[in-house]
């Protein structure tokens, strides 16, 4: 039980600290990459949706 509670605490702690990344800005030398960086968190969702499209193409065997 203690392991589960500590795991939940670690997840919440990492979530709180990771949310500060959303307001972080890239250095000026990499400012031209801003549009790409904005789209990057959505890329794993495309793979998730691709799995459903693939299964639909093979009739959910």
Swiss-Prot record:
Its main location: plastid. The chain crosses the membrane at residues 40-60. Pfam families: PsbK. One of its GO terms (cellular component) is chloroplast thylakoid membrane. InterPro entries: PSII_PsbK (IPR003687), PSII_PsbK_sf (IPR037270). It is a single-pass membrane protein. The keyword Ligase does not apply. Residues 1-24 form a propeptide. GO terms for biological process: photosynthesis. Keywords: Chloroplast, Membrane, Photosynthesis, Photosystem II, Plastid, Reaction center, Thylakoid, Transmembrane, Transmembrane helix. It is found in: Plastid, Chloroplast thylakoid membrane. The keyword Secreted does not apply. Belongs to the PsbK family. One of the components of the core complex of photosystem II (PSII). PSII is a light-driven water:plastoquinone oxidoreductase that uses light energy to abstract electrons from H(2)O, generating O(2) and a proton gradient subsequently used for ATP formation. It consists of a core antenna complex that captures photons, and an electron transfer chain that converts photonic excitation into a charge separation. PSII is composed of 1 copy each of membrane proteins PsbA, PsbB, PsbC, PsbD, PsbE, PsbF, PsbH, PsbI, PsbJ, PsbK, PsbL, PsbM, PsbT, PsbX, PsbY, PsbZ, Psb30/Ycf12, at least 3 peripheral proteins of the oxygen-evolving complex and a large number of cofactors. It forms dimeric complexes. This is Photosystem II reaction center protein K. It comes from Cucumis sativus (Cucumber). The lineage of its organism: Eukaryota, Viridiplantae, Streptophyta, Embryophyta, Tracheophyta. The gene is psbK.
């Amino acid at each position: 039980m203690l392991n589960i509670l500590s795991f939940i605490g670690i997840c919440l702690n990492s979530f709180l600290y990771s949310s500060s990344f959303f307001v972080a800005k890239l250095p000026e030398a990499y400012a031209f990459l801003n549009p790409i960086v904005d789209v990057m968190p959505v890329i794993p969702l495309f793979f998730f949706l691709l799995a459903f499209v693939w299964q639909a193409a093979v009739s959910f065997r």
